[in-house]
Amino acid sequence: MLSVILGFATSLVYGTADFFGAIASRRLKPTLVTGISAWAGLLFLSSMLVSGLFQATFSPAAILWGIIGGVFSAFGLSMFYRALAIGPISILSPLSALVAGLVPAIAGAFLGERFGWLSYVAIALVLVAVFLVGFVPGQDVRLPSPQGVLFGIGAGVGIGVVLICLHNAPASSGIATVILVRLINGLVLGGYVIFQLVTRRVAASTFKGLGPKPWLTMLATGVFDSGANLLFVLGVRQGSLTVVSVLTALYPLGTILLARFVLKEKLALSQSIGIALALGATALLAF
């Protein structure tokens, strides 16, 4: 039951990170927000080590999975933004989340994870809920292009592989793999931000006159994203990769709930149904 709680909490915290990232992206390009928040997340993880709340042992296995996870994290995010740029977001965003949950679930099956029939029903309901929660219907909804679908699937695969890497890291390594994933992600995306500035694709004046709010939202994005990584690692060390991963894929839930209560945005009927399915399926998995 604890792993179910941690998996569901992971989805809410990831969703909170996406919410703050979306707010920051109103003033800056998403790639800039992601690059800066990656380093904010690394600072947060470093503070966890210094405070003694977590420990990290950089064993060969932890380093290997951290490097692989960091590369796929950068890959998944780049594919995700490409998919959103092509659109439609209302289809490609939940598609990415669905694939991100399926990839670790398939890996879990290969690792020999088996469940009772009720748990399989609950897992299937969660995957349906993942798509419904992220899907926003409307009159202007169009079918995605093959290229958009490819980028959406690529984003989900990248995120899913990161979850597998975090699961495969030795428990004795503490949060070493999480730190390495964040470090490599920060180097790749932070390097891209520097490249944008050097080549003047983004003017340095972009950051002038921003005020504290965008910087605080980027800081929050990195902190919540790294916090979700920690919760996921704690979850898979307590229970099943499949269960924790499919619950983690519900991360759009946290985003839309904050949008509903903070920004007063209305929920579509499909999203309300998805939320109900998610809560019901989570209860089934817990009991």
Which functions belong to the PLM regions below?
Residues L45-Q55, P104-S119, V157-I175, F224-G239, ...:
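Hydrophobic alpha-helical transmembrane segments in multi-pass integral membrane proteins
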Residues V33-T34, L92, T177-V178:
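Juxtamembrane helix-start motifs in multi-pass secondary transporters
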Residues W39-L45, L95-A109, I184-V188, A228-L231, ...:
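Alpha-helical transmembrane segments of compact multi-pass small-molecule transporters, enriched
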Residues P30, I89, F115, G174-I175, ...:
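Membrane-helix interface/capping residues of multi-pass secondary transporters
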Residues M1-Y14, A56-S73, G112-V128, I175-L187, ...:
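Structural signature of hydrophobic alpha-helical transmembrane segments
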Residues V13-A17, F44, F72-M79, V99-A107, ...:
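Membrane-embedded alpha-helical core segments of multi-pass
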Residues M1-F8, G101-V157, K266, S270-F287:
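Juxtamembrane helix-loop boundary signature in multi-pass membrane transporters
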Residues M1-L12, F20-G21, R26-T31, I36-G66, ...:
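Membrane-interface interhelical linkers
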